[in-house]
Amino acid sequence: MKEISVFILMLSLIIGCNEYSTEISQEIGSVKEEPSDFFTQESESSENTEKLFDFSKESHSEWFLVNDDVMGGVSQAQIQRINQSVMSFSGRLSLKNNGGFSSVRSFLPESALASFDGLTFKIRGDGRLYSVLVTTQNPRISWQSEFETNEGWQIVTVPFDEMRMSVRGWKVENSPKIVGSKVTGIGFIISDKIQEPFNLEIDWIAAHEDSG
């Protein structure tokens, strides 16, 4: 974890806040103390897919917003169900008060993704860059993977081993990998610093297990 220690030191020098750097260090340390299976998981040689959210069944009510107001920002967002089948995550980012992100999230039962290797979802966007994220029991630490959108429907597949750790928005290079057995939350986040309206429509979300 030498790279993470270097990252923490550089962060402290850049923002001039030793207290904040120490707090992030403690949170990353809590991950280091997890059992080794937190970072490694063997896959069975069979294909398996399980639908997690189908928004034709009103499961949008299980989702909630986490915006930059948690740190004083003023970005705005909303969740809607449209056409009785799609969840719309829309709003407008603002960079005021060092803000600039908005996210929509939901919880998952513990170990619900234990036998899976990643996520697959059907979305339609607006040409902007979003990230899919997963969280563990420490919601301040997430694992994220960016994906581009366009105005047409897309099916995106993201393996867990391609996700990278983020601590309160700070990306951690050479971070440990996340595995499905530790995932307790899922979400989407936009943080491209563009102060214009955004809209991401989500049809369904599934967990997948690689075959082979």
State the predicted function of each range.
Residues F7-I14:
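Bacterial N-terminal signal peptides
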